[in-house]
Amino acid sequence: MEKDKRLVFDTIPEKFDKWRVRYDPKLFDYIIKTTGLGPGRSCLEIGPGTGQASDFAINSGADYLAIELGSHLADKMREKYSSYPNFHIVNADFETYDFGGKKFDLIYSAATIQWIKEDIAYSRVHDLLKDGGYLAMCLMRSEYKSENPELYEEIQKVYDECFDTNQPYDQHFDYMNGGKYGLTFIEEKSFHGRREYTADEHTEYMGTHSTHIALKEEAREPFFNGVRDAIIRHGNKVVYNDEYVVYLYKKG
């Protein structure tokens, strides 16, 4: 039986929690201001991981429910947030879970919803939203080429020569297709940030990417060492420019 690709991050809960990138707080401020999330409102987070995009919703005072497929990730969420009275989580599959008629003012995800088949994702979200409720889909785009083109070329050469994964990323999800499923597109909003890593830090960060977690064993050492050595040759620093994006829809 083929292993569920959606569980790839569940194999590294502690590393995922430490090294996965957090979003710009301004993005979450925008979501709260636009959707009115707060006490008396309800929200559902699809696939929270270990809480990279959970604090703002929990701290808003809204009734927060997360649905997480990975049991180890769900355990990490409970460890971090179970002391909050408005925090709830189910370890289940969003595609099939019975929410018992519950409806939400906000449903959101951070780089998670694209792991669900598009028709299922949008249709279920539409059914689970209250009239006037919102869908917020967050993602991050990053690049390091502009800061150091020579380093970028060296790292790409390592990818070309050494990268061999058991799980290529082949998800197909269009963030602009919500209108086909009865949702009204509001806007796409972007925020920007910057981060730096040493060679060793970057190795840890890369190890949280789905395709890198699933690297073939014989490729792991030459690939990670090759990227690490390239960064060391360029001052032991790699700089990423990040774009934090949210696609916002409304029901009704």
For the regions a language model picked out, list residue spans one by one:
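Conserved class I S-adenosyl-L-methionine
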Residues: 1-38
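Class I SAM-dependent methyltransferase SAM/SAH-binding core
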Residues: 44, 50-97
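Conserved Class I S-adenosyl-L-methionine
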Residues: 50, 167, 172-252
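A short acidic, Gly/Pro-enriched loop at the edge of an enzyme's catalytic core
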Residues: 97-107
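Short catalytic micro-motifs in class I SAM-dependent methyltransferases
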Residues: 111-112, 139
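A short, conserved alpha-helix within the catalytic core of class I
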Residues: 115-125
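Conserved catalytic/acceptor-binding region of the Class I
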Residues: 126, 130-195
